[in-house]
Amino acid sequence: LFNKICETPEYYVTRTEISLLNNNGTEISALIGAASNVMEYGCGSSLKINALLSALHEPAEYLAIDISHEHLIQTAKSVAKTFPAVKVGALCADFMEIVDLPNKFGGTGKAPLLFFPGSTIGNQTPGEAGQFLGRVRNLLGANGSILIGVDLKKDKNILNRAYDDAEGFTAAFNLNLLKRMKNELKAEVDVGSFYHLAFFNEQQSRVEMHLVSKRAQTITFEGSTFEFLPDETIHTENSYKYSLKEFSKIAENNGF
């Protein structure tokens, strides 16, 4: 579902990020240097890493990191086939919990580069984002660097449409949480009695996603019961938006 969201005309993030990588490859390569050791958090698709590795001068290694074993192996195999001169590795893990890199990674001795595209950093609060960057700094060492995707503040109508596409893929993605609760946690929930809501909260500078109850109802699972009034919501996700100045300050305060 998320891959379908990325292909919708409303969701600008993916195509814009790929365009940025393609159009600024020379500058990015000059900053990173030759024989780089690249690792990627959340390697769901090979499109972006292909654009980056194509721009870099003789990249030495690529380490794919993802919690989904299926996506991880698929991406690693694809990159290995496309870039036969690059040493490719794969680590199935939650990147939020990584504290050490595999000993075999970074054999060239060059400081690692973390590639973290997709504006995933926006799903954390600004405070959490700072803590995350601090952990990454410790992981990469003093000379390591990060190439990160950050979504900037923009017209709220553009943001609202991006998280509520006309084809309904984002709505299905959000409602899938209830389906998984029902199927995997054996929750008693009527999925059809909720609907998707997304809007830009200007005061908090974030897009919020909610599941809204259409009626008075209860959800029961694992011995607990949750009562909902009509129009009461489950707040499922945030996506914070920054100015360049705001995010730069967070990065600088946490070692970058």
PLM region spans:
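Substrate-binding/catalytic lobe of Class I Rossmann-like enzymes that use SAM or dcSAM, i.e.
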Residues: 158-254
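Conserved class I S-adenosyl-L-methionine
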Residues: 35-44
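Conserved beta-strand signature within the Rossmann-like core of class I S-adenosyl-L-methionine
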Residues: 139-153
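Class I SAM-dependent methyltransferase Rossmann-like catalytic core
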Residues: 2-32
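Conserved SAM-binding loop of SAM-dependent methyltransferases across substrates and taxa
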Residues: 45-58
